[in-house]
Amino acid sequence: MASMNFSPPEYPDYGTATLDPNIFVDESLNTPKLSVPDMIALVIFVMVFLVGVPGNFLVVWVTGFEVRRTINAIWFLNLAVADLLSCLALPILFSSIVQQGYWPFGNAACRILPSLILLNMYASILLLTTISADRFVLVFNPIWCQNYRGPQLAWAACSVAWAVALLLTVPSFIFRGVHTEYFPFWMTCGVDYSGVGVLVERGVAILRLLMGFLGPLVILSICYTFLLIRTWSRKATRSTKTLKVVVAVVVSFFVLWLPYQVTGMMMALFYKHSESFRRVSRLDSLCVAVAYINCCINPIIYVLAAQGFHSRFLKSLPARLRQVLAEESVGRDSKSITLSTVDTPAQKSQGV
């Protein structure tokens, strides 16, 4: 599923049998079984759905009340929306794997639902890059932030991130469709670049790798190297809460999406009928499932980062989320410059 390609299961060799769709097929010969990677993927999908839907809905609910006051809420609200959209598509993807890749949901669902995975990937990493840039400027240029950083700028940055994510998802939407075979009858959902050539397919895979993984990895590594050096050198404590949360979110993103990116690149480079391609494709659904863990892990990180979580979890989970997603002061030298998260000029010198 790095390209979300579902292949029909392996059936007995029918030799030179006709491809006439009206010919009788002995279905007793067709006894496909789920592979071990597919079964593991199904278990992961169930866990992600059960945790990701309520978890991200809770984050959306909590941050929805905070977006007018805090910029952090805007960042994490958009991240939660991206994750929630992907989680809501899980039942259909789950059903397709259970049916050995058979896709009965039509061409429109084939184009839209798997593309949500790529949209989530691009939106998440672009939003994380935006958040990281915000943290970088917040620490290294707090005066600029005090004057210009506000909800309107944050919403504009999120809008740009979503627009770019949609553009990067277009190739998946255009080249995706339902493929039908007649002996035996089988419908699969996947991408088909046969009309444009292998160079386009590899170009899309390289673009996905650069824009959805390597490029952001370089940018984020640079940002957080300087941020951590500054934090450690000045022994800041008040400004590290959100930094630690964002670092945890970023690290989990790259770890969980790495198998997806590797298999996607390998499937684009290997010849489609080679044994290497077949071996890698068997791990496809598992790699997507591992990447999907990213959709439910962020709310867990937010909650675990809240102070007093273990002792007060059952008392007020929304309060714990508000605590960890709140804005905080950023220390500079011996003075504490509190950065505004509201629009009104009078409040730009007040703590949040």
Curated annotation (Swiss-Prot):
What Gene Ontology molecular-function terms does this entry list? complement component C5a receptor activity; G protein-coupled receptor activity
Question: Which residue intervals are topologically Extracellular?
Answer: 1-38, 95-111, 176-202, 268-284
Q: What membrane topology term does the record carry?
A: Multi-pass membrane protein
Give the record's keywords alphabetically: Cell membrane, Chemotaxis, Cytoplasmic vesicle, Disulfide bond, G-protein coupled receptor, Membrane, Phosphoprotein, Receptor, Sulfation, Transducer, Transmembrane, Transmembrane helix
The UniProt entry lists the main location of this chain as: membrane
Question: Which residues does the entry place in the Cytoplasmic compartment?
Answer: 66-70, 134-154, 229-244, 306-352
Give the residue spans that cross the bilayer: 39-65, 71-94, 112-133, 155-175, 203-228, 245-267, 285-305
**Gene3D superfamilies for this protein:** Rhodopsin 7-helix transmembrane proteins
Known partners and oligomeric status: Homodimer. May also form higher-order oligomers. Interacts (when phosphorylated) with ARRB1 and ARRB2; the interaction is associated with internalization of C5aR.
Q: Could you identify this protein by its name?
A: C5a anaphylatoxin chemotactic receptor 1
Q: Which organism is it from?
A: Canis lupus familiaris
